[in-house]
Amino acid sequence: MANNSSYGENVRRKSHTPSAIVIGSGFAGIAAANALRNASFEVVLLESRDRIGGRIHTDYSFGFPVDLGASWLHGVCEENPLAPIIGRLGLPLYRTSGDDSVLFDHDLESYALYDTKGHQVPQELVEKIGKVFETILEETGKLREETKEDISIAKAIAIVMERNPHLRQEGIAHDVLQWYLCRMEGWFATDADAISLQGWDQEVLLPGGHGLMVRGYRPVINTLAKGLDIRLGHRVVEIVRHRNRVEVTVSSGKTFVADAAVIAVPLGVLKANTIKFEPRLPEWKEEAIRELSVGVENKIILHFSEVFWPNVEFLGVVSSTTYGCSYFLNLHKATGHPVLVYMPAGRLACDIEKLSDEAAAQFAFSQLKKILPNAAEPIHYLVSHWGSDENTLGSYTFDGVGKPRDLYEKLRIPVDNLFFAGEATSVQYTGTVHGAFSTGLMAAEECRMRVLERFRELDMLEMCHPAMGEQTATVSVPLLISRL
């Protein structure tokens, strides 16, 4: 394709070929570009990084794949829109939980908890407090029905404790309860005092539990990206919309022109106002961007020469506060490799991002030493920085206190010939890969309909849905699910 200063306008004028620019190559952007390409659009995808995937980032520097970003398929079932692709590629999944609950064990079925002195907490106590935590959350549901005013889940729990003294815990039992709350904070990528009581359990959960992508998500994103015109290192700085075209300018000064654009950048980037819109977006759209909340969860991945820890899904350190708690995902069970993943969220994750990678890895290892004092030093490590990375500025969206859920839909709704996609635009599946994927398909379909309606050629093309061309054949290949 010619490297000219404008894209799409001349093609449209000469041949009436519909054109679109997609901004962002995460799952939403790749899905949208793939769908539009399959609908016979001329498509260019602009990506600010030197790689595709966005918050999908499979790293191979250890000699095997590990995901620094999203790694779970939430909803291991045929209903998951990603299941057909994963099944056809023959990618194995390791089911970490058959339970689709988010109450306290959304992605783990076995775990070993320790106090800060390295003493393992009796499993009977761990299970007992898990049930107490579930009861507490059920009681917060009753509290929600009493008032229309939204409060944080932390405040709601405090009220429940005050009303139900028998649910209060002391000593090590209190610390275990804090660990469960810490796990809940990890699900939302923020602290409990920022999680909405009204909205925390309103997402739609697909059946089938949760599965780790054993070989990472990169094979899926690479498959969807095959054959697309992707321009890496193209950071969008301005989007100008006209009645019949969109002009997108990147940091080098080059401008691309097309009939429409799909904006699939993370919510954090939109909130930072690093992309100028001309004319400005409507107030209701700016409000959605401003009011929606984005959290931070990171991974510090420690690679060891051998396994020296218990054969459980999670290792955890309990503490008197959620900030002092920690947990490690044991990748050895899923992949066979001696790897532990430390996963801080919220304020702790932001504080750790201020450290160097070496210091962050050392901090994670110090948490492990609390569990296993004789732990061997890691031979390699990887550290994510989703909160401070200028290409993301956050991990994923969560329900903030006092914020209406219609903000997700407001963020999704098109503005003229601008269409929006990404996990933050998914009303049902916020914060998930399949949510991002689905919104990309939705934005592509809306874009197709608008552009072709303007061309008065609605019958010209027939778009497969979910727009993957021959990749979405009716033949269904079962998912490869294991428990080691």
From Swiss-Prot:
Tissue and organ expression note: Widely expressed.
Main location: other
Binding site for FAD: E47, R55, V236, E423
Enzyme class: oxidoreductase
Intervals of motif Microbody targeting signal: 482-484
Homology family: Belongs to the flavin monoamine oxidase family.
GO molecular function: flavin adenine dinucleotide binding; N(1)-acetylpolyamine oxidase (3-acetamidopropanal-forming) activity; spermine oxidase activity; thermospermine oxidase activity
Enzyme Commission number(s): 1.5.3.-
Keywords from the named record: FAD, Flavoprotein, Oxidoreductase, Peroxisome
Protein's recorded name: Polyamine oxidase 3
Reactions performed catalytically: spermine + O2 + H2O = 3-aminopropanal + spermidine + H2O2; N(1)-acetylspermine + O2 + H2O = 3-acetamidopropanal + spermidine + H2O2; norspermine + O2 + H2O = norspermidine + 3-aminopropanal + H2O2; spermidine + O2 + H2O = 3-aminopropanal + putrescine + H2O2
Gene name in the database record: PAO3
Pathway: Amine and polyamine degradation; spermine degradation; Amine and polyamine degradation; spermidine degradation
Cofactor: FAD
GO-annotated cellular components: peroxisome
GO-annotated biological processes: spermidine catabolic process; spermine catabolic process; thermospermine catabolic process
Role description: Flavoenzyme involved in polyamine back-conversion. Catalyzes the oxidation of the secondary amino group of polyamines, such as spermine, spermidine and their acetyl derivatives. Substrate preference is spermidine > norspermine > thermospermine > N(1)-acetylspermine > spermine. No activity detected when putrescine is used as substrate. Plays an important role in the regulation of polyamine intracellular concentration.
Location in or out of the cell: Peroxisome
SUPFAM superfamilies: FAD-linked reductases, C-terminal domain, FAD/NAD(P)-binding domain
InterPro entries xref list: Amino_oxidase, FAD/NAD-bd_sf, Flavin_amine_oxidase, Flavin_monoamine_oxidase
Cofactor note: Binds 1 FAD per subunit.
Pfam families per the UniProt record, alphabetical: Amino_oxidase
